[in-house]
Regions:
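Class I S-adenosyl-L-methionine-dependent methyltransferase catalytic core
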Residues: 1-170
Length: 170
């Protein structure tokens, strides 16, 4: 892909190798292929994807949701506050025949009212969140008990974010 467009690739599963191009106007920075491949190699050793329920927060382009769907996850919810992001995810999911539920909402408001539980909650908040704002994500997830038993909360963050003092993180 060329500079000034947002290009992603599905790493594995039924749509392995599929390249997706998102509108350049989206306010996102998709997870890199290298980081996504490393993450999914770890998850692949611990989970049966077809049995997972997924909650993708700050979903952006839907990059992570598509990867889970391609690998067989059937219950995926993608949440983002940006209308154009949600519209792109919905359109792409329909084109690829992925069962992804999209929700246009501020993630914090969604979490406060959430009734869903998930096996994996993936969050990719903006890197410019301050620490207090960033730490609200795990705080709400654990206070509201939004993870199923043996579930995992995965938060992508900048190298400057320190989670070592926060309980439940390894």
């Amino acid at each position: 892909c060329f500079i000034k467009i947002i290009c992603m690739r599905i790493i594995s599963g039924t749509n392995k190798g599929k390249r997706l191009v998102a509108p350049k106007k989206l306010p996102v920075r998709p997870t890199t292929d290298m980081a996504k491949e490393a993450l999914f190699n770890i998850l692949n050793n611990n989970f049966q994807f077809s049995q997972l329920s997924i909650l993708d927060l700050f979903s952006g382009t839907g990059n992570i949701a598509y990867e889970f769907a391609s690998r067989g996850s059937k219950e995926i919810t993608a949440v983002d506050a940006n209308y154009d992001c949600v519209k792109f995810i919905k359109k792409t999911a329909q084109e690829l025949d992925f069962n992804i539920t999209t929700i246009k909402s501020d993630v914090f408001k969604f979490l406060e009212k959430a009734y869903v539980k998930a096996d994996i909650i993936f969050a990719d908040p903006p890197y410019d969140f301050d620490e207090k704002e960033f730490l609200k994500i795990p705080q709400i997830v654990f206070e509201k008990n939004l993870l199923n038993q043996n579930g995992q909360l995965i938060i992508e963050h900048s190298k400057h974010t320190n989670l070592s003092d926060f309980p439940n993180f390894i």
